[in-house]
A protein has these predicted regions:
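N-terminal helix-turn-helix DNA-binding core of bacterial DNA-binding proteins
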Residues: 2-42, 65-74
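Conserved segment of winged-helix/HTH DNA-binding domains
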Residues: 3, 69-90
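Conserved phosphate-binding and hydrolysis motifs of nucleotide-dependent enzymes
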Residues: 16, 47, 55, 63
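Alpha-helical residues within the helix-turn-helix
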Residues: 35, 46, 52-53
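Beta-hairpin "wing" of winged helix-turn-helix
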Residues: 53-62, 69-70
Length: 90
């Protein structure tokens, strides 16, 4: 039940939905995502953190940069279904 709550919270914000849609095109640096949406870095950091905690995005660090992407094939089916649903609804 806790995972469901994290996912629904993550999907309850338009900016987080837009981030997921942007990541369909591939991995993006947090700075690229922030610039793309024109939000404050701290605001985007919070959105990305919520998406990460819900399992809707993966991240990797390269030096001082953090890159985000949609989860790979190892993601739980619930996560895959949520992302597929968003993609189809957009």
């Amino acid at each position: 039940m806790r995972n469901l709550m994290k996912i629904t919270k993550a999907l309850s914000d338009e900016n987080r939905i837009r981030v997921l849609l942007a990541l369909r095109g591939g991995e993006l640096c947090a700075c690229q995502i922030t610039e793309l949406f024109g939000l404050a870095a701290s605001t985007m950091s919070k959105h990305l953190s919520i998406l990460y905690q819900a399992g809707l995005v993966d991240s990797r660090k390269d030096g001082r940069w953090i890159y985000f992407r949609l989860p790979d094939g190892k993601a739980p089916s619930t996560i895959k279904k949520a992302i597929d649903w968003i993609s189809k609804a957009a």
